[in-house]
Swiss-Prot record:
Pathway assignment: Pyrimidine metabolism; UMP biosynthesis via de novo pathway; (S)-dihydroorotate from bicarbonate: step 2/3
Annotated organism of origin: Cronobacter sakazakii (strain ATCC BAA-894) (Enterobacter sakazakii)
Enzyme Commission designation: 2.1.3.2
Protein name (Swiss-Prot/TrEMBL): Aspartate carbamoyltransferase catalytic subunit
Keyword Secreted: no
Name of the gene encoding the protein in the UniProt record: pyrB
Keyword Transmembrane tagged: no
Protein role: Catalyzes the condensation of carbamoyl phosphate and aspartate to form carbamoyl aspartate and inorganic phosphate, the committed step in the de novo pyrimidine nucleotide biosynthesis pathway.
A Gene Ontology term for the protein's cellular component: cytosol
Pfam families membership: OTCace (PF00185), OTCace_N (PF02729)
Keywords: Pyrimidine biosynthesis, Transferase
Length: 311
C-alpha cells in the first residue's frame, strides 16, 4: 500500500485523517521497539526555530539524528538574515527549501507554517508550533502516550485544565480525539482562558459531549486522562497573568479516588500548576510523555520522507 504521508505538509492535526493518525502511531510503536539508525541516512532536514523551544526542538533534532539524517538550522532567528537584515519569511523559506529534504519550523505567528508551504517548492513543512494556533507533533506524542497507557483512543473521558485559550496543544488534541468514537471532554479553566468557541462548536457538530467545570476535584474520579497546561506568561499581559496563574494547581492530595489507570499529562514546561509531590504518584506520566516525542516525531519524519516505508 502506498504511503499517504509521503512528501505531505503537516501543519494542522486536521491535515491527518484517522487512518493516517493510526499509521503514525503504529510506526512510532515499531520504531520504539526496533530502532532504525540509518533510515534517513541520506536526508538533510532543516530545524528552523523562530521562537524559543527546549523539548520540541531537542526532541525533533534527536529524532533526526537517531534516524541518521543530517541536521541544519537555527534556534534563534535574531541571528539570521530574517532577524538581522529584514528578509521576509517567504524568502527565507524559499532559500532553505533548496538545501534540504524537509523543513521543521516553529514560529510565533499564527499561520506562519501554512504560509511557509506556499514558498517551500514542494519540500514538506512540518509545523513545530505556530503561535497559539496548532502544534500537531505534540498531539501525535500525546495520542501515542494515551494509547500506550489506556490501550485505546476511544471511549475515554479527558479533562483539560488551565490555559485552554492560548494553549495550542489542547486545541490540537481535542481535534484529534474527536476523530475517535465515544470520547467525552471536561474543560476546567478560568473564564479569561476558556476553550475557544470554535473547538466547542466542532465538538457539538460531531455530537461529542463536553462540560465545563470550576475545579479539578469535580472530575478527577471519572477521567482517564487529566491533561494539565501552564498559564503562558508570554501570551498574557502581566496583570492578567498574575490573576490566573495560580487558579488551577494539581496536588497529590487531589488525586485521591482517581481511577487506578488515570494518567496526568502535561506538554511541559511545568511551572506551578503541578506540585512536585504529584511526580511520585503512579498517575504522573508527563516525563514519559515527553520521551515519547522522540518516537512520534521519528515516525512522522520517516513517513514523510520515505515513499515506501517497511519496518
Amino acid at each position: 500500500m502506498a504511503n499517504p504521508l509521503y512528501q505531505k505538509h503537516i501543519i494542522s492535526i486536521n491535515d491527518l485523517s484517522r487512518a493516517e493518525l493510526e499509521l503514525v502511531l503504529e510506526t512510532a510503536a515499531k520504531l520504539k521497539a526496533n530502532p532504525q539508525p540509518e533510515l534517513l541516512k541520506h536526508k538533510v532536514i532543516a530545524s528552523c526555530f523562530f521562537e524559543a523551544s527546549t523539548r520540541t526542538r531537542l526532541s525533533f533534532e534527536t529524532s533526526m539524528h537517531r534516524l541518521g539524517a543530517a541536521v541544519v538550522g537555527f534556534s534563534d532567528s535574531s541571528n539570521t538574515s530574517l532577524g538581522k537584515k529584514g528578509e521576509t519569511l517567504a524568502d527565507t523559506i524559499s532559500v532553505i527549501s533548496t538545501y534540504v529534504d524537509a523543513i521543521v519550523m516553529r514560529h510565533p505567528q499564527e499561520g506562519a507554517a501554512r504560509l511557509a508551504t506556499e514558498f517551500s517548492g514542494g519540500v514538506p513543512v512540518l509545523n513545530a508550533g505556530d503561535g497559539a494556533n496548532q502544534h500537531p507533533t505534540q498531539t501525535l506524542l500525546d495520542l501515542f502516550t494515551i494509547q500506550e497507557t489506556q490501550g485505546r483512543l476511544e471511549n475515554l473521558t479527558i479533562a483539560m485544565v488551565g490555559d485552554l485559550k492560548y494553549g495550542r496543544t489542547v486545541h490540537s488534541l481535542a481535534q484529534a480525539l474527536a476523530k475517535f468514537n465515544g470520547n467525552r471532554f471536561c474543560f476546567i479553566a478560568p473564564d479569561a482562558l476558556a476553550m475557544p468557541q470554535y473547538i466547542l462548536d466542532m465538538l457539538d457538530e460531531k455530537g461529542i459531549p463536553w462540560s465545563l467545570h470550576s475545579a479539578i476535584e469535580d472530575v478527577v474520579q471519572e477521567v482517564d486522562i487529566l491533561y494539565m497546561t501552564r498559564v503562558q506568561k508570554e501570551r498574557l499581559d502581566p496583570s492578567e497573568y498574575a490573576n490566573v496563574k495560580a487558579q488551577f494547581v494539581l496536588r497529590a492530595a487531589d488525586l485521591q479516588g482517581a481511577r487506578a489507570n488515570m494518567k496526568v499529562l502535561h506538554p511541559l514546561p511545568r511551572i506551578d500548576e503541578i506540585t512536585t509531590d504529584v511526580d511520585k504518584t503512579p498517575h504522573a506520566w508527563y516525563f514519559q510523555q515527553a520521551g515519547n516525542g522522540i518516537f512520534a516525531r521519528q515516525a512522522l519524519l520517516a513517513l514523510v520522507l520515505n515513499r515506501d516505508l517497511a519496518l
